[in-house]
Amino acid sequence: MATFFKKCIYFSYRTTTILDFCLTAGEDKLSTAVEKWHDKAKGKSAIDYGFHLMIGDLTPETEAELPQILEQEGITSVKVFMAYAKEFQATDRTLFKAFKIAKDLGAVVMVHCENGSVIDELVEEARRAGHKEPIYHALTRPAELEGEATKRAIELAHIAGATLYVVHVTCKEAVDEIIAAREKGYNVYGETCPPYLTLDQSALAQPGFEGAKYVWSPPLRPKYHQDHLWNALKAKQLQTIGSDQCSFSFKGKKQLGINDFSKIPNGGPFIEDRFSILYSEGVAKGKISINEFVDMISTSAAKIFGLFPQKGTIAIGSDADIVIFDPDVKREISAKTHHMNVDYNPYEGWEVTGEPVSVLVRGEYVIKNKEFVGVLGSGQYIKRALKTTAAEALNI
């Protein structure tokens, strides 16, 4: 995974504020992890930033510490995984506890919805059968298991009275569960990401080991799922488009799984080109309007995560965070020209229209005419307001 320093350099090329995932795995105290994340950012970021707190199974100590950390640090969002048993997967009991704590504080629980236990069994079955190709990453993580986990998370959140944010939704099965819950009045929000809207499962079946470049979780789905995602965005049943940035170089990283698909590091480089991809494939093709585009990548997220109205709008009293976007620029995406610290691009060779050309943070240029003019260390840590988060988001 890219370091915080490297991420801030190329995040600032397209973005005014980031919320980074603070990893707590392996730490006895949540506060220790948060301190480490502050140290990573100190003096290095040219844009404003905050944290999502990522938790695994809660110990009695971390369970007691969680409310205090969220309040002290102004963190309004906790992420929990229902997959990755060996690393991050939480039990349903921990997930429910997180929902209860979040409900009492007015925080949001972000959930990676896949049935990790069943996926692990399917992976072992494929390995025993001698399958090692990247395509089996997708075949062992079927959409039905994303849909099942999404429904389970929705019901647990509802019982706890909490607000749920389903991250990186990929498929019709999960979309249908979110729509059904929202129609019943549940506080559920959904996010998808550029690759799920524009790439499909066939990318993992490329000759040789090229498919490893497209291994992330949840996996890419068959192409027909894309229409369901676009339609859900248009209908505001999915509210945001996130980056899900987590890149690994092909050489030396992705290649670790050349003889075993389950050892390919999960993640891809999406952050830099996401605006151009979404504008070209969404706005330019008439799937969403320019105003909907802005809402999905900025305003709705600011409301859900307690940044609004400081961020996510241009208004008196708000931060003058502005991205100037030229809709007429045409360019070809390539790893040879991108700014990300990774040796490939999943959109290599794509011709796109539209590009951010200047970025202002609190009224000061960070990028001007595509050149970095910001000051490292000028980015500020943004504390967000608990209690107001869910209320601000209710009209989304």
Language-model features and meaning:
Residues M1-K44, E61:
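Metal-associated gating/positioning segment near the N- to mid-region
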Residues K132-G161, K213-Y214, T240-I241, S247-D328:
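His/Asp/Glu-enriched, well-ordered alpha-helical/loop segment
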Residues L30-I47, F96-V111, D273:
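Alpha-helix-loop-beta-strand connector modules within alpha/beta enzyme cores
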Residues E61-I241, C246, G257:
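Histidine/acidic residue-rich metal-binding segments in metalloenzymes
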Residues T15-T17, I47, I75-T76, Q239:
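Short acidic/polar active-site loop segments enriched in Thr and Asp
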Residues Y10, Y49, V78, H112, ...:
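Divalent metal-coordination and catalytic microenvironments
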Residues M1-A2, C22-T24, G50-E61, L139-E144:
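Active-site mouth loops of central-metabolism enzymes
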Residues L256-D260, I316-I382:
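C-terminal cap of metal-dependent C-N hydrolases
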